[in-house]
Amino acid sequence: MESIEQQLTELRTTLRHHEYLYHVMDAPEIPDVEYDRLMRELRELETKHPELITPDSPTQRVGAAPLAAFSQIRHEVPMLSLDNVFDEESFLAFNKRVQDRLKSNEKVTWCCELKLDGLAVSILYENGVLVSAATRGDGTTGEDITSNVRTIRAIPLKLHGENIPARLEVRGEVFLPQAGFEKINEDARRTGGKVFANPRNAAAGSLRQLDPRITAKRPLTFFCYGVGVLEGGELPDTHLGRLLQFKQWGLPVSDRVTLCESAEEVLAFYHKVEEDRPTLGFDIDGVVIKVNSLAQQERLGFVARAPRWAVAFKFPAQEQMTFVRDVEFQVGRTGAITPVARLEPVHVAGVLVSNATLHNADEIERLGLRIGDKVVIRRAGDVIPQVVNVVLSERPEDTREVVFPTHCPVCGSDVERVEGEAVARCTGGLICGAQRKESLKHFVSRRAMDVDGMGDKIIDQLVEKEYVHTPADLFKLTAGKLTGLERMGPKSAQNVVNALEKAKETTFARFLYALGIREVGEATAAGLAAYFGTLEALEAASIEELQKVPDVGIVVASHVHNFFAEESNRNVISELLAEGVHWPAPIVINAEEIDSPFAGKTVVLTGSLSQMSRDDAKARLVELGAKVAGSVSKKTDLVIAGEAAGSKLAKAQELGIEVIDEAEMLRLLGS
């Protein structure tokens, strides 16, 4: 007679097998009623023997207790976004850039997938068992949605098959099929619940429930499309090969993934999917095109927040007609005056649209737009509403001309438009309340000074009450003054003060980015910080010297030079330093002169570090003249292997590359 343990093992194995056939292979062998019977049998046995329940049991998909709030998970490998193209010409230009950058006649094949309109998630398996899941968030840090993801039947709690890596992070999209979306809304209308505008909102709302039991009732599904962390195992050296391997391990992959041998085949795939879009049964907003070879991907690399080897080819946006009620003007962080059309509300691609950007005065002139006109609205990229054209044949008699302001609508300062630029700007600088608000919001944002708890509404109140005029004023705030703001109690106020104190310790690159210099994003700020090393050197740099920094041209160099030439900006920086803002003193990075065992070497980190974070380790290595790479190749000089080091360590040993452990790294860093 079988033991209880054997019965449980057999039932779990059988149920996982049928889940795989149903969700991955789309070839069920048994009817739903038989699956339900097996599940009931397993649940009854586990109820009688709770000490034998395992976390990966199919019964454990049922939602756990509600959470008070989501905790955060930091992505070990950032979840990058993709650049978009919207027409064949742009795609062909992307194709040419890839071919040119590879600088060879070697063949490029493309792996083409559906661009699902859902929520990007990261799922981590350790020894084949699902241990955590997170949203994309800002690409660096996401929300912990492990309990909710465990309720999604399409996602295996345990992988099956051979050669499963010790740690495998799968990336993919959670989405809601059209039938499930309609059922949810039908139930909501009947019970007076929330009706969702589109399947994507419904999927996001379902996945971000604090109560996993609610998520468990929603018919969410999942397709995987990539990998993040990979340790203690190997994967095929092509993107398609990896997807097929995922499928063998029980992970769902779209059956529309196609390998294309040329740009012409990619375009044919795009048009075929566009034609089939209405019959897919779920929402997509384009196709994703990736270089199939992992070796070629590595050579192409990344730019800022996106890979050079992939692009999202978006479908034409959906359009609707409505009327322009008025045109108002918004003022941005750099003083840019942006006209915004206030519309008669209309549903476009499932979203109620009441505003649309008009970009600038040239765009208004190009459109020939007047207030009161009937216009065609498009959600560009299915996200940002914009006015496509005016329906002149239906222009009402009482339309009014759009008059672009000569003075800032917020502070009254002169509006100027530099020759050769399309954007008109307020000249008020920080005396302009709108610019001040947006500049401060940028200054405290996560990727800048990262002041936790300092949200937009707090900044708005601080500016309106004239508590804060410059970024330096933020560090003069007291808990008592903050308590006077709306919805700000003593505890919350003290938390903000503590966060401001913590934010004083930053990096030179973050500080530069936080200053909000025109055209200086994160990548440029990092480049400037690495090249000049000190604030004094950067402030004294000429336009010619600035252009020696990689990817800095005449326009960016001029903006940086002009920013530091402005006395008011230098005063703000001095005030910030006086308030205690600081960063580690730079170590001169000169591979020929620096006395460091890492100087001039290409270093790869793998495995988990116990004494410092990987980010901190990378920063120290760079300070000491190393170039930190993400993968092992013949050009790698040194591999630092932490706990549970995987395929990178194996490859280093195969290539005969020097390998040291964390203890040796710390010793060398100290020397």
Curated annotation (Swiss-Prot):
It is an enzyme of class 6 (ligase). The active site is at K115. Coiled coil: none annotated. Its EC number is 6.5.1.2. Its cofactor is Mg(2+); Mn(2+). InterPro entries: BRCT_dom (IPR001357), BRCT_dom_sf (IPR036420), DisA/LigA_HHH (IPR041663), DNA_ligase (IPR001679), DNA_ligase_AS (IPR018239), DNA_ligase_CS (IPR033136), DNAligase_adenylation (IPR013839), DNAligase_N (IPR013840). GO terms for molecular function: DNA binding; DNA ligase (NAD+) activity; metal ion binding. One of its GO terms (cellular component) is cytosol. One of its GO terms (biological process) is DNA repair. SMART domains: BRCT, HhH1, LIGANc. The keyword Ligase applies. SUPFAM superfamilies: BRCT domain (SSF52113), DNA ligase/mRNA capping enzyme, catalytic domain (SSF56091), Nucleic acid-binding proteins (SSF50249), RuvA domain 2-like (SSF47781). Keywords: DNA damage, DNA repair, DNA replication, Ligase, Magnesium, Manganese, Metal-binding, NAD, Zinc. Zn(2+) binds at C408, C411, C426, C432. Residues 593-671 form the BRCT domain. The keyword RNA-binding does not apply. It holds the Pfam family DNA_ligase_OB. Belongs to the NAD-dependent DNA ligase family. LigA subfamily. DNA ligase that catalyzes the formation of phosphodiester linkages between 5'-phosphoryl and 3'-hydroxyl groups in double-stranded DNA using NAD as a coenzyme and as the energy source for the reaction. It is essential for DNA replication and repair of damaged DNA. NCBIfam families: dnlj, PRK07956.1. PANTHER family: CHROMOSOME TRANSMISSION FIDELITY FACTOR 18, DNA LIGASE. This is DNA ligase. It comes from Escherichia coli O17:K52:H18 (strain UMN026 / ExPEC). The gene is ligA.
